């Protein structure tokens, strides 16, 4: 296993729309393991392949307290949603920034598991929010896109300053 580099906003590669995964391969299994390792190391609860410059419809998630319930979503589709909620969200691609984002309170997602088997899951709470956030990445959307242009510009400036200080 290896850790992967997480793309940071405003990197334009985060805007690329992911393509469906056609075949489950050993290479895909390695990517999944590397994504989990990266997500856990970065202390995230979800990671979309787009964030690690792999533009395929793949999401890994673990919202459990003990980090022992890894979930894989290949070619996920949001097929139903209800209600409205939201929390202050963060993102591995937008470090040290948080903002309130409106989300559906309850969702149903259809996907393939890591073995290529189809499944559906109903989710609410943190899992529902996390899945919506990660699935946004697959279509080139970031949580900052829900914010006003002024707030988005402030975040961009903050991240540019952080990047300069890291050099």
Curated annotation (Swiss-Prot):
Tell me yes or no: is Hydrolase among this UniProt entry's keywords: yes
Query: Which Gene3D superfamilies does the record match to this protein?
Result: Peptide deformylase
Q: What is the superkingdom listed in this entry's lineage?
A: Bacteria
Listed cofactors? Fe(2+)
The reactions it catalyses are: N-terminal N-formyl-L-methionyl-[peptide] + H2O = N-terminal L-methionyl-[peptide] + formate
Q: Which GO terms describe its molecular function?
A: metal ion binding; peptide deformylase activity
Q: Which residues bind Fe cation?
A: 91, 133, 137
Cofactor binding remark:
Binds 1 Fe(2+) ion.
Q: SUPFAM superfamilies per the record?
A: Peptide deformylase (SSF56420)
A Gene Ontology biological process noted in the UniProt record is: co-translational protein modification
The active site annotation covers: 134
Q: Where are the transmembrane segments?
A: none
What's a Pfam family in this record?
Pep_deformylase
What CDD domains does this protein map onto? Pep_deformylase (cd00487)
What keyword terms does UniProt attach to this protein?
Answer: Hydrolase, Iron, Metal-binding, Protein biosynthesis
Main enzyme class: hydrolase
Q: Which Enzyme Commission numbers does its entry carry?
A: 3.5.1.88
Q: HAMAP family, from UniProt?
A: Pep_deformylase
The Swiss-Prot or TrEMBL record describes its family as follows: Belongs to the polypeptide deformylase family.
- State the protein's purpose: Removes the formyl group from the N-terminal Met of newly synthesized proteins. Requires at least a dipeptide for an efficient rate of reaction. N-terminal L-methionine is a prerequisite for activity but the enzyme has broad specificity at other positions.
What is the protein named? Peptide deformylase
């Amino acid at each position: 296993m290896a850790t992967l580099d997480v793309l940071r906003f405003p990197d334009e590669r985060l805007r690329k729309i992911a393509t469906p995964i056609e075949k489950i391969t050993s290479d895909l299994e390695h990517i999944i393991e590397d994504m989990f390792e990266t997500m856990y190391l970065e202390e995230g609860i979800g990671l979309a392949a787009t964030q690690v410059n792999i533009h395929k419809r793949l999401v890994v998630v673990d919202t459990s307290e003990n980090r022992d319930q890894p979930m894989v979503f290949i070619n996920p589709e949001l097929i139903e949603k209800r209600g409205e909620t939201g929390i202050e969200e963060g993102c591995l691609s937008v470090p040290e920034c948080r903002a309130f984002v409106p989300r559906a309170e309850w969702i149903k997602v259809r996907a393939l598991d890591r073995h290529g088997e189809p499944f559906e899951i109903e989710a609410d709470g943190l899992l529902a929010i996390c899945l919506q956030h990660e699935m946004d990445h697959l279509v080139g959307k970031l949580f900052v896109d829900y914010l006003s242009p002024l707030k988005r510009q402030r975040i961009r400036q903050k991240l540019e300053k952080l990047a300069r200080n890291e050099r």
